[in-house]
């Protein structure tokens, strides 16, 4: 049974997903179907947690929209994800950044920036 699960996950795995860690600011283009039309909707926010592994991996992205905090749990292997770009790499000392929920204003999205070495 375990081999069957691994086989199914290997065939359905998304390979072009960038490395994302809590604290990173990401922009995700999601396919939204409204009636017969299909359009792309951008969701940009801070990754406050990642959970699971393999085909069950999800990330929780939080943004502030018109003064209201909005969180979205996004499955990494979802066919509705068109593209994912990392806008900024954040430096977090925790695996889960749930303390950002209690903050208001600019402090709600403030995470130190991680300096990345350029890869050649």
Swiss-Prot record:
Keyword Ribosomal protein part of the UniProt annotation? yes
Report a single Gene Ontology molecular function: structural constituent of ribosome
InterPro entries the UniProt entry points to: Ribosomal_bL19, Ribosomal_bL19_CS, Ribosomal_bL19_sf, Translation_prot_SH3-like_sf
Sorted alphabetically, the Gene Ontology BP terms of this entry are: translation
Q: Which UniProt keywords apply?
A: Ribonucleoprotein, Ribosomal protein
Extract the coiled-coil ranges from the record.
none
This protein's superkingdom? Bacteria
Cellular component per GO?
A: cytosolic large ribosomal subunit
Concerning its family, UniProt says: Belongs to the bacterial ribosomal protein bL19 family.
Q: HAMAP family attached here?
A: Ribosomal_bL19
Protein's name in the database: Large ribosomal subunit protein bL19
């Amino acid at each position: 049974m375990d081999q069957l699960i691994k086989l199914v996950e290997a065939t359905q795995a998304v390979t072009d997903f960038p490395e994302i860690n809590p604290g990173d600011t990401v922009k995700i283009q999601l396919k939204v179907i409204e009636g017969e039309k299909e359009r792309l909707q951008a969701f940009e926010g801070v990754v406050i947690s990642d959970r699971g592994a393999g085909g069950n991996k999800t990330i929780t992205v939080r943004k502030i929209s018109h003064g209201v905090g909005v969180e979205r749990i996004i499955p990494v292997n979802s066919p509705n994800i068109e593209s994912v770009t990392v806008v900024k790499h954040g430096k977090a000392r925790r695996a889960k950044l749930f303390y950002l929920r209690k903050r208001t204003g600019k402090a709600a999205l403030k995470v130190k920036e991680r300096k990345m070495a350029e890869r050649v």
